[in-house]
Amino acid sequence: MEFTQVILYTDTDGRARFREQAIPLTEGKPQARLSALMPCGGLQLRMSPVGFRSEFHCTGAPQWLFVLGGMMEIGLQDGSTRLFKPGDHFYSADTLPEGATFDAQWHGHCSRQVGDEPLVTAFVRA
C-alpha cells in the first residue's frame, strides 16, 4: 500500500513542474497503514479571499500544502495548471536554483483561489 505524493519541484532547467512519487505505507496495522514518521518544522494556516491571485513566485522553503476548504489552482510557466480541492495536497519544493536571480517569466508558479468560497490551506514546513 502507498500514498501518492504530488510534488511541485524545480527541474534542471529552472522551471517548476509537477511529478508524483509513492510514499510506502509500511507501518501501522492492516486496517490503518502508516508511512514512516516525517519531520516537520511548523504549521501555518492561510485564508485567501474570493478573487485571490498571486504573482509568479518560488517556494521559500519546501513545505506540504493541504487544501482544507475552497479550491486552488496552481499555474506553471509552461501554461499548464492543476486544480486542488478540499482534501487534496501537494509538496511544494520549487525553490529558486542556487545562484539564480528570480525571473518572473521563467521561474516559479502562481496560485489563485477558484470558485465562490474562500481558499483555506494548511502549510506544513518540511
Please tell me what each predicted stretch does.
Residues 1-9, 79:
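Short acidic, Pro/Gly- and aromatic-enriched capping/linker segments at domain boundaries
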Residues 12-56, 62, 117-124:
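A short glycine-rich, His/Asp/Glu-containing loop-to-beta-strand
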Residues 49-52, 70, 76, 96, ...:
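Short acidic (Asp/Glu) patches
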Residues 60-78, 88:
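Glycine- and acidic-residue-biased ligand/ion/polar-headgroup-sensing regions
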Residues 61, 80-83, 101-107:
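Ubiquitin-like/PB1-type beta-grasp interaction modules and other compact soluble beta-rich domains
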Residues 78-96:
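Short acidic-glycine-tyrosine-enriched beta hairpin
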Residues 91, 100-126:
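A short hydrophobic beta-strand segment most commonly corresponding to one strand
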